[in-house]
Each structure stands twice: as C-alpha cells, then as structure tokens.
Amino acid sequence: MTFKDLRDFIAQLEQRGALKRIQVPISPVLEMTEVCDRTLRAKGPALLFEKPTGFDMPVLGNLFGTPERVALGMGAEDVGALREIGTLLAQLKEPEPPKGFKDAWAKLPMYRKVLSMAPKVLKDAPCQEVVEEGDDVDLGRLPVQTCWPGDVGPLITWGLTVTRGPNKERQNLGIYRQQVIGRNKVIMRWLSHRGGALDYREWCQKHPGQPYPVAVALGADPATILGAVTPVPDTLSEYAFAGLLRGHRTELVKCRGSDLQVPASAEIVLEGVIHPGEMADEGPYGDHTGYYNEVDRFPVFTVERVTRRQKPIYHSTYTGRPPDEPAILGVALNEVFVPILQKQFPEIVDFYLPPEGCSYRMAVVTMKKQYPGHAKRVMLGVWSFLRQFMYTKFVIVTDDDIDARDWNDVIWAITTRMDPKRDTVMIDNTPIDYLDFASPVSGLGSKMGLDATHKWPGETSREWGRAIVKDEAVTRRIDELWSSLGID
C-alpha cells in the first residue's frame, strides 16, 4: 500500500472499510475519547469526526487503532511483514562486510535504495497554503482534545516536533505531548534524554539566552509519523526512512521563519521558538499508565506562525490504561524490534512487549540457552542495546520451548524454573520514565531481571527436572479415535 499524504491514506482506508465518517456532532472535550476508546476496544475503524462540537475543522482519531492499520501505514500489507522492515533496520544498524563479490553485488540494491531516499525539498507546499502570523495566531481554533475528566486542559498529542542541534546537520523528529496554555503558547513536554530535549540543551550551551527554533507538524503522512517512533539507526534520518516505507522520497519544505524543514503535505504546522528560561507547570494529564501524572515543569513553546492546508484535518489521539492507541502501536512495532535484537543476539527466538505492561515496561524474551549465565547476558543486552528499552523495568528470559506471548506458558516457566533469590537480578539507580510514580525518585529507579530458563551445571547443584512429554504414538491413535468417543 502506497500513499502520498494523510488524505490519500484516509481515502484508501475508507475504500477498505477501515475508516468511518462520523457526522453526528461530538465534542473534543471527553466525548471523542469515549467514542475512540469503545471503537479501539472493539477493533473498529479509524474515525473522522466531521462535525466536532464548536469547530469547523474535522478531527481524525483512532488512526492506528489496530496493528493492521499500523502495518498499512508503514507500507506493509500485514503485521507479519513488519519483520522485514526490522531486518532492513538491523542491516543498516549493524552492516556486515560482504563475504565476497557475489554477496556485495546482492546487497548493492538495498544500499542504493537507501541512498536514493534523501528527502526532496520543495519551494511551495500544501502545508503553507494558508499562513497566520503574529496576532492572527490562535490555537483555540484547533479542535484539540481534552481527554479525561481530571485533565488540566486541551492536549496536542500527535504533533511531530522538528528540532536541530547547533552542531548537527540532521534534524530530529519526536512526538511529545503539548499542553495548550494560551492563544500562542504550549508546553513542550520532552523528557531529558529525548532527541528534542538534547538538541535544546546543546543550543542553550552554545547560544545562551537566544530563542530556539522549533516546528510542530500535525497531520503528516503515516510513514513520516511512524518513522519518528521506530528505532531508526543514527546513520539514517527519519525522513529518509519514511521514504523507504512509502516507496518514494519524503517531500519537505523550509519553514517560513526558520531553516527547519517540515513535511510538505502536513495538514497544519506550528512554527515558533522556545525562549530559554521560560518554563511552566505541565499537567496533570491521564496517561498511558492509566493514571494521572504529577505536575512538572517544562519549556514553553511560543507559536509565532501557523501554516496549514486549505480545510485542514486535525489528527488526534488519547492515552490511557491499555489498550489505547500507543499500546496498539507497541504491538505492531514489536515485530520490528525482533530482527534488530536477533541481529545482535542470534540466540533470541522471540521478544514480546506485553501491551498490558504499557508496551515498554516489561519484556519477555525466549532464547536458545547455550551456557550458564547466558540468560543474564541477554537481559542486560535488552536493557542496553536499544534506547527504546531504557525504561523497561522487568525483563523475563526463558527457554525456547515457552511461548513468549502466552502468559500461561510464561507463568509456568517462572514458577517452575526460578529460585527467587538466585534467579532475580536487581539493578538500582537506572533511568526510569518520569511518568513512573512508583519509582522513589523522579526519573531514577530500579530494574528487575527474571531468569526463568532451565538451569545448567554451575547454576544449580541439583538434578534438573525433566519435562513431561506425551507419547506420540498414543496421541496419534487417540486422534484417530476421537470423533467416535462422542466427547464433543
């Protein structure tokens, strides 16, 4: 499935019966969350609210509410095909030297395709068909959702934030929630280790006191949005990766007020600056944990300019206790992670991030164990190899006879193959999600690894239990007789 922009994607989803237009007036304050939540839990379609109460701008919700739609957004026809994307990323992250001329020739098309996907910069773009500046800027015209009863106010959720560090050519794309606090001001809630926050910190060090340019694209095409949340190697820009997913180069346009480049087909772009030292209290908001987060201070983004398409579509979502849209994204992106991990750790058979664990706080790994202590090496590798797992609190490692995605199997392995003292690894003072109020200090907490593998000599002095296995001949005979027994 290929598409040129968000509108093309919407049209193709509608042709497939995977998008529903809602013509009944629905309020962005609480009501859209209720409708989207019920639809997502029923594995229903994407929703285009054509008459949001109090606004004349349609709202797109539940766009990535099923793993299948995430796959379509990444240019794949099914979720299983996402493993191929993971294999490509693994090759780009850790390229292997060719084994000979034939191997080099075979790999050449892949690298040539990557090199050919550099973004294309346009002079004119749909996202700049309408320009509002200065006193004409009014974020109150956007149908920004207020998702939960305890939320402090409207929250921009699907904004693609574009930044650049002072010493970098490559731009960073990140998705950070933004609390609307005024006609032209939002709070930029980026965590300290995220790309945008790092770029901003470097800017403040090199240009103290000077305003920092930022742009936020709303309603970019799905490949660009999903490229921003995928573990793209540092050698590959998110824009180039989006081109690979889409099958053609990402088209960009230079912002009107800075050198930042934004997706040319975006529905809405917010341009402006962060004034160093201007901070505000952010929150509380209901979040993907299922709780309201505590109030914390973050930089204020002053919007100097809004550019947009004619009759734009506002793309939004809500976050709450799983399942929610981020959890569904996690289920799909899980398939991308597997080949990347297997490239570094070939002994890994499967890797699973349960959506119930907020899609990143717990991981289950199955592996082909080869020596004593092997499980501990793998769990430490999971924590350190990809920054996406920096906040994973629990890593469960077990043997390849266990289905990582079946809790009955996993719990059986934990309760029969673990000694709590010997097989539990505790690591203190590690990075933890700021939203994790269970940690004793904001942003710093502990991690637990559970070794639920069979134990080898050296790990135990006892004879290890032998698993019960059925007699295959008896199983075949009963299979043949089963229908005659009248049991079901």
UniProtKB/Swiss-Prot annotation:
Pfam families: UbiD, UbiD_C, UbiD_N
UniProt superkingdom: Bacteria
Coiled-coil segments: none
Taxon lineage: Bacteria, Pseudomonadati, Pseudomonadota, Gammaproteobacteria, Pseudomonadales
Primary location class: membrane
Cofactor: prenylated FMN; Mn(2+)
Cofactor note text: Binds 1 prenylated FMN per subunit.
Binding-site residues for prenylated FMN, renumbered to this chain: I175, Y176, R177, R189, W190, L191, R194, G195
Source organism per UniProt: Pseudomonas paraeruginosa (strain DSM 24068 / PA7) (Pseudomonas aeruginosa (strain PA7))
Function: Catalyzes the decarboxylation of 3-octaprenyl-4-hydroxy benzoate to 2-octaprenylphenol, an intermediate step in ubiquinone biosynthesis.
Record protein name field: 3-octaprenyl-4-hydroxybenzoate carboxy-lyase
Active site per UniProt: D287
This protein's pathway: Cofactor biosynthesis; ubiquinone biosynthesis
